[in-house]
Amino acid sequence: MSERYSKVFSLSENLYAEGAPVVIAAGALLKDNQTGRVVAQLKLRNISPKTIKAATVSILSLNTVGNPLGEAIRYEYLDLSSTRDTDFGSKSAIPMPDITTRSFNAAVVEVIFADNSIWNASEAVW
C-alpha cells in the first residue's frame, strides 16, 4: 500500500529573523495522494525565555518555477504553552489554497507570550 502523503518540498532548516523569539526549525510541503490536496507543515522552536501562547505565520504558495500563486495566507497556532527550546506546530497541517503549490516561503509575523506581551516581525527577513 502506498503512502498517504508525498513530500513535495522542504524548507531550509533553522530559518531565523534577527530579534525573533522563534526559529522555523523545519518546514515541508506534502501532497495528499488520495485527495490531491496540498498542505504545509512547520516546526517552530521557541528561543525566548518567555513562554509562548500563540503565534501567527505567513505562507506564500509558489508554483514549480517559484512564482507566487496569489496572496500569502496566515495561519495561527493557538492555545500553546511553549517554553524555551521546545517545538510546536509540527502536527498542524496548513491547507494550501492552490493544489498546484510546489514550494513556499514562510515567515513568523507575530508571537504572543503568556504575559500578553507581543512581538511583531515588522520588516524582519526570514
PLM segments and residue spans:
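Low-complexity, acidic Ser/Thr/Pro/Gly-rich terminal tails and inter-domain linkers that flank the onset
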Residues: 1-43, 47, 122-126
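Short, solvent-exposed, Trp/other aromatic-anchored flexible loops in extracytoplasmic proteins
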Residues: 48, 63-126
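Beta-strand signatures of extracellular beta-sandwich domains
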Residues: 56-60
